[in-house]
């Protein structure tokens, strides 16, 4: 990518106009006090560089029970939240509508509510191109099969009456909209859903800053001009919480907070590692200019990794998403803010299409590589929990939370962890056992000797195991140079994959979901049936063996044949 093709830094001025002061020690609003945790400490090497000693992971006995510290299980409610009545005639403006969650959210709103219109921001050259993209990526999507069956011959007419494409770009000033479109939305919109983001973990730092920090800021500034706005909804990620361990509660991030802090008694504090968003923007801009004669993309990816590690996040994506939350909370003034933090989002569990998914996400490259026999080992603690949530559960929780908080009360911030570990835990050894069962029953045509996944806690041990297997394979296949080259590339890819997702294999935090459970308790019986948010009902064996991987193969791996 040339310098001219790189991210424009003109929008960075938007953030620098408000210099956020975070030099003083910030109050701890993120965690309750916990005297049972060893919180870690900062030490210094012989050359003066600080390094972080991770805190001890709490023992299982120290954690709440399966539903500990959560609201009681839901009881029947005749009144409910009032989801249908809230959305009746309401107009929604959504960014990221062609993404996995955005598309699922749109489908559910069209199928289950009687809302007014959905304005969908579409990156396109003109109105005609926007309509074409909306038709191709949303109306013709396999995800809309139930809606298509429901409306029959009037399906296209119905969707076109509800979905209004808006030409724009969240990475441009004023979101790239023309004045007429902007005025129409400002007059009519009730709820804004900000779902657009870059989900590439280690993308260019400048790009991640622009789309995950500046873009939400631009949208919030636009939101303040909307006359009837009732709620601003921001789709974030549970991993904005950084390298913290133990139980993580649904609290908003505060400006300048880093990913290291645990509680008020920690030696690690935001005063020692203050995160200044303006400084980070300027640093990325300078790096972009300085590296124009070199490999700009490589340099800016490296910079993102370095900054994330320094401030206590696993990667630049998580760090910039955290910064996005901070800037929204700091600049919203009297705009009510709802933040949804899903964990690892994967395919639909139930409706409208079990197994439907878009894109090769998180665990999916691991699953497919394993199914081909190219990834027999992984970096993870087999006894630790992983946290996965089907995308339909995220969409339903978002809709229910919007209805609950969209009725004007006061301009507050509400945070929801959309996660499963607290109420329906899944260990790594269980997940990989289910994946093994699937490929044993339905092997890929190109699969090679599927064995049970081996898990390592050291990268060096994993690398040696992979290379030893390749050496054995080369010995059997002979001296064919092409085969040796292919095997070498496979090992390199496997190592890269394991290293990229190493953080998830040893992640020792658990996302508290008290707000989601309280939401479930408030829902009526009918609402619970229509908007499934109860994660205790997920059967992980069924999900992996019969739903998710089948969907992955159909929708992502281009319909790979099953060799049963």
Can you say where each PLM-predicted feature lies in the sequence?
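Hydrophobic structural elements of the Rossmann-like NAD(P)H-binding subdomain
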Residues: 233, 340-341, 418
């Amino acid at each position: 990518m040339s310098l001219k093709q790189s991210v424009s830094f003109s929008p960075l001025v938007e953030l620098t106009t408000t210099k956020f002061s975070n030099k003083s020690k910030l109050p701890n609003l993120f965690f309750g006090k916990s005297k049972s945790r060893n919180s870690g400490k900062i030490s210094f090497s012989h050359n003066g560089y600080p390094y972080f000693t991770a805190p001890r992971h709490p023992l299982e006995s120290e954690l709440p029970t399966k539903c500990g510290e959560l609201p009681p299980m839901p009881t029947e409610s005749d009144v409910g939240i009032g989801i249908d009545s809230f959305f009746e005639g309401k107009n929604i403006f959504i960014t990221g509508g062609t993404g996995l969650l955005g598309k699922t959210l749109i489908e559910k709103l069209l199928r289950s509510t009687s809302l007014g219109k959905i304005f969908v921001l579409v990156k396109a050259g003109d109105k005609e191109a926007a309509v074409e993209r909306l038709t191709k990526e949303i109306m013709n999507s396999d995800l809309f099969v139930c809606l298509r069956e429901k409306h029959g011959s009037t399906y296209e007419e119905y969707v076109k009456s509800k979905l209004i494409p808006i030409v724009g770009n969240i990475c441009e000033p004023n979101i790239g909209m023309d004045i007429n479109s902007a005025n129409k939305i400002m007059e009519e919109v009730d709820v804004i859903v900000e779902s657009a983001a870059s989900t590439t973990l280690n993308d260019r730092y400048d790009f991640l800053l622009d789309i995950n920090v500046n873009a939400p800021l631009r949208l919030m500034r636009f939101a303040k001009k909307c006359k009837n706005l009732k709620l601003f909804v921001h789709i974030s990620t549970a991993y904005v919480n950084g390298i913290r361990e133990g139980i993580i509660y649904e609290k908003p991030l505060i400006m300048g907070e880093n990913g290291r802090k645990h509680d008020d008694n920690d030696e690690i504090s935001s005063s020692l590692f203050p995160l200044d968003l303006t400084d980070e923007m300027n640093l990325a801009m300078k790096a972009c200019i300085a590296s124009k004669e070199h490999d700009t993309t490589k340099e800016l990816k490296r910079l993102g990794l370095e900054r994330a590690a320094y401030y206590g996040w696993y990667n630049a994506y998580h760090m910039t998403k955290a910064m996005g939350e901070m800037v929204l909370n700091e600049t919203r003034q009297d705009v009510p803010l709802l933040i949804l933090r899903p964990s690892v989002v994967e395919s639909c569990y139930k409706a409208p299409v079990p197994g439907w998914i878009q894109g090769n996400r998180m665990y999916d490259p691991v699953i497919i590589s394993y199914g081909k026999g190219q990834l027999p080992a992984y970096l993870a603690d087999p006894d630790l929990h992983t946290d996965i949530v089907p995308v339909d559960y995220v969409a339903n929780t978002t809709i229910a939370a919007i209805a609950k908080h969209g009725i004007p009360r006061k301009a507050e911030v509400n945070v929801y962890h959309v996660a499963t570990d607290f109420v329906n835990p899944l260990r790594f050894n269980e997940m990989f056992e289910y994946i093994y069962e699937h490929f044993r029953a339905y092997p890929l045509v190109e699969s090679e000797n599927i064995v049970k996944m081996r898990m390592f806690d050291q990268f060096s041990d994993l690398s040696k195991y992979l290379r030893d297997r390749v050496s054995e394979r080369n010995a059997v296949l002979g001296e064919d140079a092409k085969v040796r080259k292919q095997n070498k590339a496979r090992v390199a890819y496997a190592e890269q994959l394991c290293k990229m997702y190493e953080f998830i294999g040893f992640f020792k935090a658990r996302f508290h979901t008290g707000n989601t459970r309280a939401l479930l308790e408030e829902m009526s019986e009918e609402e619970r049936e229509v908007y499934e948010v109860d994660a205790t009902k997920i059967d992980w064996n069924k999900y992996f063996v019969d739903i998710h991987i089948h969907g992955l193969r159909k929708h992502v791996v281009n319909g790979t044949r099953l060799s049963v």
